Amino acid sequence: MRILLTVLIALLVGVTSAPAQQGQQHLIVTSDALKWVDPPTFPGAKLAIVQGDPSKEGLFVYRVKFPANYKVAPHFHKASENVTVLSGVFFIGMGEKFDQGSGKELPVGGFVSIPPTHRHFAWAGGQETLVQVHGVGPTDITFVNPADDPRKK
């Protein structure tokens, strides 16, 4: 009975994971191959897509370079957001009001995972800060206070 159960589990895993693997290939991206653009949501920062398209279904990865002391007003996303600090220091706070006193410092290697629709804000430390954001799209950004949305200015 145990052998039969083991065989059935192995077959089930093989059958359910095969479609996910079909059509996929590995991806290697070097930092010099990234195309940096001026994102309308973060004026003064730079953004590069590493993989996928955040506005469409599926995995996405992008990087954002923030100048020293850059502030991101309270906002939220319809998908989970996962952020890793690659260089500099990044601060993250939770809530609908920008409050540096309640933020958490994330040094290089620091990570934060933010659930969908969870209000949060962020800022860079005293030097240029590079973060990598990944998740499963589609996602977006909605500023808590519409007046903070740079796309509307």
Functional labels for PLM-detected ranges:
Residues 1-4:
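Positively charged n-region of N-terminal signal peptides that target proteins for export
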Residues 6-15:
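Bacterial N-terminal signal peptides
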Residues 19-60, 146-153:
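A short, N-terminal "cap"/entry segment at the start of jelly-roll beta-barrel domains
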Residues 25-27, 101, 121-153:
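Double-stranded beta-helix
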Residues 50, 109, 131:
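Divalent metal-coordination and catalytic microenvironments
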Residues 53-55, 67, 90, 96-117:
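Short acidic-glycine-tyrosine-enriched beta hairpin
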Residues 67-70, 76-97:
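Glycine- and acidic-residue-biased ligand/ion/polar-headgroup-sensing regions
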Residues 72-74, 92-93, 114, 119-125:
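Short beta-strand His + acidic residue motifs that chelate non-heme Fe in jelly-roll/DSBH
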